[in-house]
């Protein structure tokens, strides 16, 4: 069974991020006491939005360059991205419940997943260049999409570091 890239569903409208930011600002402005500093909440929200933007960028690149079916390497990286973002969702929930040891454990799992993503990316790019007869358009398209997905995975580790720093600060 061949899977298609979910470009139509992955692409979010430009107003969705703006709407999220507006809600965040309104919520922070109307809440007198927050469990963690407003600046920390703001920084975390920006970093989480960056992951959505980077993921959307990869989807737009697929659509723009006519990727109809993801390559095996793309699917491998997308699987890592899905697993990493699922870990982040759990880690953010642990911040709310003040489960700081759980945040540190999630950070370790995210780091492991990010390293796995690095290996998948490196191997895929290496195969692209070591493969004999390959169309230069295919090579560029694959490389750009793989780089975009890898950047989103890398940013998940940055968010995990931020969550870990918040756990140290408030724990």
Task: Walk through the language-model features, giving the residues of each.
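Cytosolic, long alpha-helical scaffolding segments
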Residues: 1-171
């Amino acid at each position: 069974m061949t899977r298609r890239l979910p470009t139509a569903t992955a692409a979010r409208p430009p107003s969705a991020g703006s709407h999220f930011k507006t809600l965040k600002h309104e919520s922070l402005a109307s809440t007198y006491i927050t469990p963690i500093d407003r600046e920390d909440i703001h920084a975390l929200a920006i970093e989480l939005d960056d992951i959505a933007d980077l993921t959307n960028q990869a989807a737009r690149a697929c659509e723009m360059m006519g990727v109809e079916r993801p390559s095996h390497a793309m699917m491998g990286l997308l699987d890592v991205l899905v697993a990493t973002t699922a870990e982040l969702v759990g880690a953010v929930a642990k911040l709310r419940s003040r489960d700081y040891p759980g945040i540190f454990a999630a950070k370790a799992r995210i780091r492991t997943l990010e390293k796995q993503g690095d290996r998948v990316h490196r191997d895929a790019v290496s195969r692209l260049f070591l493969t004999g007869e390959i169309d230069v358009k295919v090579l560029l398209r694959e490389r750009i999409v793989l780089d975009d997905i890898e950047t989103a995975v890398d940013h998940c580790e940055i968010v995990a570091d931020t969550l870990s720093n918040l756990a140290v600060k408030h724990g």
